[in-house]
Amino acid sequence: MVPRLSAGTPPASPARWLAGRLAVVTGASQGIGAATAAAMAAAGAHVVLAARDQHALDEVAGRINDAGGQATPLPTDVSNEAAVQRLFAEVAGVGQVAALVCAAGVLTPARFAETTSAMWDETLRVNLTGTFLCCRAAFTAMVPAGEGRIVTIGSLSGVYATEKFPGLAAYNVSKYGVIGLTEAIAVEGKEHGISAICLSPGAVDTEMLRRANPALRPGLTPDDVADLIVALLDSRLAPASGANIPLFSNA
């Protein structure tokens, strides 16, 4: 059984664990990543923003810094191992990474029989391999500190026994993989004080989803997801480490 949370009922957050800590958010140029970076900065974290689009990344960082937060943009292709290594080397120059949120992702809808090898490879390379590369780098950096918190982004499309839709074969597989990866990180992170949790939202009103399915009416906003991520990071994650939390519609 997985716990079911709605966007309107985030867990209590009596203390700001994030305050004064260094965090990395991938996919931070738009959507869930951008909203999460802003929410984490508002909670007092110094947020390193990672994404491929430098212009969009600079805009997000500018808004956060103008609002009194602290954000450092570092353009990165999370599917490139060397780029991820450079990212975390630069992060180490800033300070000790305490939290990672993996929100980078792609969605290219295609019927199963029409899914090309290139579509398949790109989806898994960004959504799953990119998450693996960033989690591995962050995990390695967190071990000496004896603590760390990792949040990955799955999807209801990757949750067993939820309704599935046509055209999402590669995407669904990538998100099933992210959920399994998070469980593995939690198992090995326990002895190092590192917690990992996966948040699997339903349809979120993002540019990526609008491009993929303009007719879909999302029941969640990026801020809904971001607020829950911050609440989770500010709470004691250890007892729930390894869990996958489905996030259902706010409607």
Task: Cite the ranges covered by each PLM segment.
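Conserved glycine-rich cofactor-binding loop
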Residues: 22, 29-30
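Residue(s) in the substrate-gating loop at a strand-loop-helix junction
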Residues: 155
